[in-house]
C-alpha cells in the first residue's frame, strides 16, 4: 500500500520542533538531511563513506564468495594470481555498479523503509544524478578490467547480470509481483559463471549446476529477511511474498526451495567429480539448512508471528550454508592435487 506524508503533518512537526526545549530538538544536521532542499555539509570522509555505502558492500561480499571458489574448481587447483585479481576486482566493480543503479531506482522505496531510509540517497548525502554517473563509471571500469584482465565472455556475462538486475528486477519486477525474488534473483546467479569462464573461456555443466544452486538458494534467503521487515516492505508498497501471503504459506515455499537447493548441490558431486570434503559439507550443512526451514514452518503453523517466528535464524544460516558450500568447492580440488 502507498505511504505518504501530508503537508499538514509536516507543518505540525515543524511547529513542534520550533517550540520544543533545546534538549528535545532534533539534530539540525538530521533536519537538513530529511528536507528536500539543501543537503547536509559533509566532510571528505563522510562523502567517501556515502559513495562506498551506495555500493552495498555486504551484498558484494556474498557475490564474490560464489566467484573465487569456482575459479579453483575450474583450474583443478590454484588459479593464476593475476587472473584471480582481475576477476575479483572486475566482479567487485560490476556488482558495485549494479547496486548503485538499484539505489538510484529505489530511492523512493528506501525513504519509506526504516531499514533503508538512512542510505545516502534518502538522506541527500549524494545527489541522485551524481550517483547515476558514479554507477556508470563503475560499470565501465568493471568491463575494462574483466575484458582485458580475464576475457570478454566474462565481461559480457557481468554486463548481462547487471542489465538483468537493473531493468528486469529493479524496474520491472520488484514493485509489481511477489515473484520478484525468484526471477530477479537470476542476476545473482552469474558470479559462478563469471568465475568459471574467466579460467576456461567457456561455459560447462559445472557452472550451470552452481548457477542453479544459487537460483534455488536465493528465495529462502530473501524471504526470511522479508519476514523480519514485512511491515517495511508493506509500507513501501513492495509485494514481497511475506507481505501478500500468510506466514505458513511462505514458510512452505521456503522449505520447498531449501530442499531443492540442497538436492541440486548434490548434483555437483557426479557432474564435477567432487571429493569427500564437498560431499560431507554439502550433506551436513544442507541438513541444518533444511532443519532451520522446517522449524520456521513449525513456528508459522503454530501461529507465531513477527519476532516469535525467528526468521533471522534461517537468514543467517542461509549465508553460512552458501559460504561453507563454496569454501568446500575451493578446498576439494586442492586435496586432489
UniProtKB/Swiss-Prot annotation:
Bilayer-crossing residues are 59-79, 81-101, 130-150, 153-173, 196-216, 250-270, 271-291, 311-331
Spell out the reaction equation it catalyses. Answer: heme b + (2E,6E)-farnesyl diphosphate + H2O = Fe(II)-heme o + diphosphate
Gene Ontology MF annotations: protoheme IX farnesyltransferase activity
Polar residues biased stretches: 1-17
What topology in the membrane does the UniProt record assign? Multi-pass membrane protein
What other facts are recorded? Carbon 2 of the heme B porphyrin ring is defined according to the Fischer nomenclature.
- Name listed for the protein in its UniProt record: Protoheme IX farnesyltransferase
Origin organism of this chain? Answer: Cutibacterium acnes (strain DSM 16379 / KPA171202) (Propionibacterium acnes)
Amino acid at each position: 500500500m502507498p505511504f505518504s506524508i501530508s503537508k499538514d503533518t509536516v507543518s505540525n512537526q515543524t511547529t513542534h520542533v520550533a517550540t520544543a526545549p533545546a534538549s528535545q530538538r532534533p539534530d539540525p544536521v538530521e533536519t537538513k538531511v530529511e528536507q528536500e532542499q539543501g543537503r547536509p555539509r559533509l566532510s571528505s570522509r563522510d562523502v567517501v563513506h556515502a559513495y562506498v555505502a551506495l555500493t552495498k558492500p555486504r551484498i558484494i561480499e556474498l557475490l564474490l564468495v560464489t566467484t573465487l571458489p569456482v575459479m579453483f574448481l575450474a583450474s583443478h587447483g590454484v588459479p593464476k594470481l593475476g587472473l584471480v585479481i582481475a576477476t575479483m576486482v572486475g566482479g567487485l566493480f560490476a556488482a558495485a555498479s549494479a547496486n548503485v543503479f538499484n539505489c538510484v531506482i529505489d530511492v523512493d522505496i528506501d525513504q519509506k523503509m526504516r531499514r533503508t531510509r538512512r542510505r545516502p540517497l534518502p538522506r541527500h548525502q549524494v545527489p541522485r544524478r551524481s550517483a547515476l554517473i558514479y554507477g556508470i563509471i563503475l560499470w565501465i571500469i568493471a568491463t575494462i578490467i574483466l575484458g582485458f584482465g580475464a576475457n570478454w565472455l566474462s565481461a559480457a556475462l557481468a554486463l548481462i547480470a547487471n542489465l538483468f538486475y537493473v531493468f528486469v528486477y529493479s524496474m520491472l519486477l520488484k514493485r509489481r509481483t511477489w515473484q520478484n525474488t525468484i526471477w530477479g534473483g537470476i542476476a545473482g546467479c552469474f558470479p559462478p559463471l563469471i568465475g568459471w569462464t574467466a579460467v576456461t573461456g567457456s561455459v560447462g555443466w559445472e557452472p550451470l549446476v552452481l548457477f542453479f544452486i544459487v537460483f534455488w538458494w536465493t528465495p529462502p534467503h530473501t524471504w526470511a529477511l522479508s519476514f523480519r521487515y514485512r511491515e517495511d516492505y508493506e509500507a513501501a508498497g513492495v509485494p514481497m511474498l511475506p507481505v501478500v501471503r500468510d506466514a505458513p504459506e511462505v514458510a512452505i515455499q521456503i522449505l520447498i526451495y531449501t530442499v531443492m537447493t540442497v538436492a541440486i548441490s548434490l548434483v555437483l558431486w557426479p557432474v564435477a567429480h567432487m571429493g569427500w570434503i564437498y560431499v560431507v559439507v554439502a550433506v551436513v550443512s544442507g541438513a541444518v539448512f533444511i532443519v532451520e526451514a522446517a522449524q520456521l514452518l513449525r513456528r508459522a503453523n503454530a501461529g507465531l508471528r513477527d519476532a516469535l517466528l525467528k526468521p533471522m535464524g534461517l537468514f543467517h544460516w542461509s549465508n553460512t550454508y552458501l559460504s561453507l558450500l563454496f569454501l568446500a568447492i575451493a578446498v576439494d580440488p586442492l586435496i586432489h592435487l
